[in-house]
Amino acid sequence: MSDTEGLRAQAGSLGVVLDPSQASRLTRFEELLADRAIPLGVVSPSDANRIRERHILDSLRAAPVVEDADLAADLGSGAGLPGVVVAIALPRLRMLLVERRPRRAALLELVVEELGVSNATVFAGRVAEMPGPVDVAFARAFAPLDQAWAQARGVLRPGGRLVYFAGAATTIPTAPEGAVILDVLRTPVLESSGALVIMTRQ
């Protein structure tokens, strides 16, 4: 089984169907994360040998949650996790990669161009300055839940959702003020992943 075939099978176990082109681009993204994101300090060197599970698959599991959305934003996108991964998996979804740090925003521009992610756009600025509103906001390794919600609520349309990636060791928190938790999703096939906490305005 080739590398891309293996990724397609792993994605299938998460309920995500990838065609060969999508799998190939995600495999190339793994290489870019190793070659560019680790030296930049966006991805930990300790993740070098587990980028697929720790980052690609962990991000990919959010795709089925947002299949019905038209416009999403990845807050503090960093290296494009989960934004680039979800944008590749869901080409109909328009993705805004929000990153205020210039070097990381430049990395995102390179990734989007090299992988041909035409439905993703980089916004080099603060969350409060980004265009909106959006249907979905992602927060992965961005901020504690209450802080992530405080920033996300201002860019979500009525009925919009925050998809928050809780750490593997994190106890599921109570909803921040003004929010309600719609669902808490766990992924048993990814042992190192925490829960996805889905929230909206109360």
Pin down the residues of each PLM region:
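Class I SAM-dependent transferase core
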Residues: 1-73, 103-118
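Short, charge-rich binding segments
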Residues: 65-66, 87-89
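Short, flexible active-site-proximal loops enriched in glycine and acidic residues
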Residues: 74-75, 97
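Class I SAM-dependent methyltransferase "Motif I" SAM/SAH-binding loop
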Residues: 76-80
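S-adenosylmethionine
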Residues: 83, 90-202
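Short loop/turn and capping residues at structural boundaries
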Residues: 22, 48, 87, 123-126
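Acidic, metal-associated active-site segment
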Residues: 59, 81-84
